[in-house]
From Swiss-Prot:
GO terms for biological process: reductive pentose-phosphate cycle. The lineage of its organism: Bacteria, Pseudomonadati, Pseudomonadota, Betaproteobacteria, Burkholderiales. RuBisCO catalyzes two reactions: the carboxylation of D-ribulose 1,5-bisphosphate, the primary event in carbon dioxide fixation, as well as the oxidative fragmentation of the pentose substrate. Both reactions occur simultaneously and in competition at the same active site. Heterohexadecamer of 8 large chains and 8 small chains. It comes from Cupriavidus necator (strain ATCC 17699 / DSM 428 / KCTC 22496 / NCIMB 10442 / H16 / Stanier 337). Its EC number is 4.1.1.39. CDD domains: RuBisCO_large_I. Mg(2+) binds at K204, D206, E207. This is Ribulose bisphosphate carboxylase large chain, plasmid. The gene is cbbL2. Induction: Total RuBisCO activity (both chromosome and plasmid-derived enzyme) is high under lithoautotrophic growth conditions, intermediate when grown on fructose and poor when grown on pyruvate.
Amino acid sequence: MNAPESVQAKPRKRYDAGVMKYKEMGYWDGDYEPKDTDLLALFRITPQDGVDPVEAAAAVAGESSTATWTVVWTDRLTACDMYRAKAYRVDPVPNNPEQFFCYVAYDLSLFEEGSIANLTASIIGNVFSFKPIKAARLEDMRFPVAYVKTFAGPSTGIIVERERLDKFGRPLLGATTKPKLGLSGRNYGRVVYEGLKGGLDFMKDDENINSQPFMHWRDRFLFVMDAVNKASAATGEVKGSYLNVTAGTMEEMYRRAEFAKSLGSVVIMIDLIVGWTCIQSMSNWCRQNDMILHLHRAGHGTYTRQKNHGVSFRVIAKWLRLAGVDHMHTGTAVGKLEGDPLTVQGYYNVCRDAYTHTDLTRGLFFDQDWASLRKVMPVASGGIHAGQMHQLIHLFGDDVVLQFGGGTIGHPQGIQAGATANRVALEAMVLARNEGRDILNEGPEILRDAARWCGPLRAALDTWGDISFNYTPTDTSDFAPTASVA
């Protein structure tokens, strides 16, 4: 029996239309109530002059799911009403009349299980160059628990890492070997030994030290692991150094990782620029080989820093936790790199929470249940020194790696003295905190007292004092004034 003519007329009109507005094609539904199984995304959009914000939001939903520029009859061969993403809410951005927050819901069946590459191809693959929108930024996402459970997450996590290192109750300490380029393998190993012997837990390759003419990767691995073993024997502590296995092909990265494992390394490192498939592959390798995976967020500033266009680092942090890294650089707030204190704390929450609660002051727009995924150890690195120890512990607590590169290797008395200065400052601050003192306000006094019996710390404070890089952050909260760390 044929359907009534009125029922047939509606789809016929739709498919005869050629080009329709996205909101008329079903990509806007202001009455939609997101389901627990929906994947949610929040975009900051800047529509072109004269473009309706609701239409712009519907366009984002359409172009990140099933739409193209014209109506296609093959929609009728799919469950198109289910597969269409739905923009369901548009809010003006506070104090910015040109921008709007656009909330979009995606049915879970649009995404492949356990694949960040597939997720990103949909969510950010096409919409950011769409002409009706001047600029777009992916601010936050919420993943349903069913989707989270398709990822293995970090292979080690914070608790297991502390158990392997036998180090509890304080932040971990590290340093990036400097200069990042130009050292021979032997001299590189000497720097690693001095830093670990002086009291650091980790040393680290920088993002662009791979295998250059001045130092082949195999030489670096050999000299570094010799230094790690000697420092461990001298101090009685478990030590490590992040060996960067980033290379031009996955096959070469696996080869370097296997060599690091054969030398007894407990940790390897990769750069963010290797891509999501590579990150997940290396995470799987680390899980199979009981290795810690450290990720340096090289290149992230090209798309995370600008507030009007790109992808917020809180989203990158969520993807990285799903992808399975054990460490990730998340900012310092007080160092040389971009970072508003409240916004950076939001990144740390994403790494360390079992359940992340909505917190607009820290840029967290959604609740996120991380199910059984292990926690990621955040890393604070870039322009920090012993004189900021009280600020760092106040901001980030214990579960963090504090990496003092220049703040160790630039010490006037040498590398080992620089490491000792940082270790003494850390121990003094943790002790004072555990005794109930207000370390944020009393921090300088606590450091000066500790420096009375520690020459390296005294020299560090004399050299760097209370130096901070006080520039106005670019990526700040829209719902709170920029916070001071002092």
